């Protein structure tokens, strides 16, 4: 089922999401809905708070293969990269955001197994962006102000 994307101003987007304690059918259904919603909206990632659920679940589109990450935790970061990001919860806006170039993170899959992942480039950026959502942060909170320019006449 495609779910409504919560937009900037919705309090759930500024709230730290709760850890998933049990991976039951409700969590699996939410994950399926999140994948369907992400694809419908042409997104590359989606966090549960963006569809109104305060749970630490994200989905990312990796080479057209959606991955569900439950209770993701970034454990290593290296390098730094500045690039523009958009967000389904902040429509029509792109802002420059500094992110780690490479990350190591762990998360549970839908079977409850904890796995360790290494990511770089776009995948690393998407995972960091979605984990920010779980911590109540939006791209507007991370925008690099010195790179924002206004047109002067």
UniProtKB/Swiss-Prot annotation:
Q: Which reaction does it catalyse?
A: N-terminal N-formyl-L-methionyl-[peptide] + H2O = N-terminal L-methionyl-[peptide] + formate
Gene Ontology molecular-function annotations: metal ion binding; peptide deformylase activity
The cross-references to Pfam families, in alphabetical order and at most eight, read: Pep_deformylase
Source superkingdom: Bacteria
Cofactor binding note: Binds 1 Fe(2+) ion.
Which InterPro entries does the UniProt entry name for this protein?
Peptide_deformylase, Peptide_deformylase_sf
Q: Which GO terms describe its biological process?
A: co-translational protein modification; translation
Q: Which UniProt keywords apply?
A: Hydrolase, Iron, Metal-binding, Protein biosynthesis
Q: Where does Fe cation bind?
A: 87, 129, 133
The active site annotation covers: 130
Which EC number(s) does the record attach to this protein? 3.5.1.88
Does Iron show up as a keyword for this record? Answer: yes
User: EC class of this enzyme?
Assistant: hydrolase
- State the needed cofactors, names only: Fe(2+)
Q: What does this protein do?
A: Removes the formyl group from the N-terminal Met of newly synthesized proteins. Requires at least a dipeptide for an efficient rate of reaction. N-terminal L-methionine is a prerequisite for activity but the enzyme has broad specificity at other positions.
Concerning its family, UniProt says: Belongs to the polypeptide deformylase family.
Q: What is this protein called?
A: Peptide deformylase
């Amino acid at each position: 089922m495609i779910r409504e994307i919560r937009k900037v101003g919705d309090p759930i987007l500024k709230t730290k999401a709760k850890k998933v304690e049990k991976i039951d059918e409700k969590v699996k259904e939410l994950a399926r809905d999140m994948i369907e919603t992400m694809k419908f909206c042409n997104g590359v990632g989606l966090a549960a708070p963006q569809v109104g659920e305060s749970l630490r679940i994200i989905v990312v589109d990796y080479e057209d293969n959606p991955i569900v990450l439950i209770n993701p935790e970034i454990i290593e970061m290296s390098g730094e990269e500045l690039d523009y990001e958009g967000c389904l919860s902040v429509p029509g806006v792109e802002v420059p955001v500094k992110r780690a170039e490479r990350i190591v993170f762990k998360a549970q899959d839908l079977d409850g197994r904890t796995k360790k992942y290494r990511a770089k480039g776009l995948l690393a950026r998407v995972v960091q962006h979605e984990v920010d959502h779980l911590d109540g942060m939006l791209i507007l909170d991370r925008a690099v102000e010195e790179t924002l320019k206004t047109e002067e006449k």
